[in-house]
Amino acid sequence: MFWLVETQEQFDKVQFELGPEIFVLPIQRHPEMHPSIYAPLCLYLRDVTQPKGFLVNYFHPEALQFDPLQVKEYLRTFKKIYTPDKKALSHTYFGTNTYDLNLFEHKEVKKQTHAHSYFSQRYHTEEDLNLIIPIVKHFEQCEIIFDEYLPVIKKYIPNEYHDDLSNVFWFIERNGLKVNSAFERYFDLKRPFLSRYNSYTFTQYNLNTTTGRPSNTFNSLNFAALPKENGSRSVFVPRNDFLLEIDLTAYHPTLIGQMVGYNSPTGDIYEDFAAEYGMDRTEAKGLVFKQLYGHIFDQYKDFEFFKLTQKLIEQIWSTFMKTGKYTVEQTGKVFKQSDLPNMNPQKLFNYVIQHWETYSNVAILKEIIYIINNKETKLVLYTYDAFLLDVNKQDKEEIKQILTVFKDKNLQIKTSYGPDYNTLQPL
């Protein structure tokens, strides 16, 4: 039986071989290249109950090219498509029938064919690395990867939050960030082909972190910590009319207040604390932060917000110590003692808050994406407590709707806009 699909006759036969549930893996030009830049070289398909899979060739030079659009339509017919990284696959095929295995149980497949090890070491700086590797070796590598993930497939349980998480960050990634000609002056990328395409650079969010809070370092550029002092942010410019940043203020205290059921007299926890202990808001903010991320001082332990917070910290820690884990019910995220050495109550609480922050933000992102879907305005960057939009002036009503999303969730925001990411001014 053949394994390489490069003709219509072979593709027709494959359709009789594959059942309703399959494993899919795209092969990019370079294993580290952002999947938005080019279509994949090949696509691996395997029935999860069968002893081997098939490799459909799109652009590898060792075989005839098959139509990617025909395969894309075929993928819509399956009941379930399992893949190691749904977000990555979505740049090739986006569907409600895809399931992310790594979000369910994270795996790092280190085993490689000898060809992959050899060529990757010698030619990792080549844009077309995977075109150099023989196509049969790509097939063999895909078979290895499938074998690693088969145990995960067998116990996989669908998770709506995982779907939402993957979907919203795929939506952001695919837009890219427009940059000007000064980009290379500030950012010396050794392999620009991994993330640059024409006048755009692409972000890539890592969803498999300890807390579940996405990191955003890609191709040596940390988008979550771009320096503000050296002018490097000026290279990020709009494709439309201006950039708009929506920045959440007092976000973690607000989230914690919602979690513990704290009713703020002023609507601002910093103001509440300042009023009760006779200080200005700036001093109150510093003290609240120190205690949320350190420990609650004895002289302030009777402040209602801190009393409720301390009770939650103790509840989380008690569950963690008694059962060996703490599960966030809304997302299914499990913090296990076996994975988290040297843990303490405050540190675990901070982990949970970072995860809750992400859960809250995914809900916000879903609403924003729904509002601007098919509009010229693009959501281009997310940094924990800030959302950056590339705005078209014609979308005024949509921007108003987006601001209402935050108001409806009782979240305080600051907005700023400008001609580049470095010169944003209060709106």
What are these regions (language model features)?
Residues Y156, K190-F193, K393-L427:
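Polymerase palm active-site segment centered on the conserved acidic dipeptide of motif C
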Residues I153, G176, I368-N373:
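Structural motif corresponding to the C-terminal cap of alpha-helices
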Residues F78, G95, E376, D408-Q412:
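A generic structural signal for alpha->beta connector loops
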Residues T98-D100, L379, L411-T415:
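Generic structural signal for residues in well-ordered beta-strands
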Residues F2-D12, F16-G19, L25-G53, N57-F66, ...:
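Acidic, glycine-rich two-metal-ion catalytic cores of nucleic acid-processing enzymes
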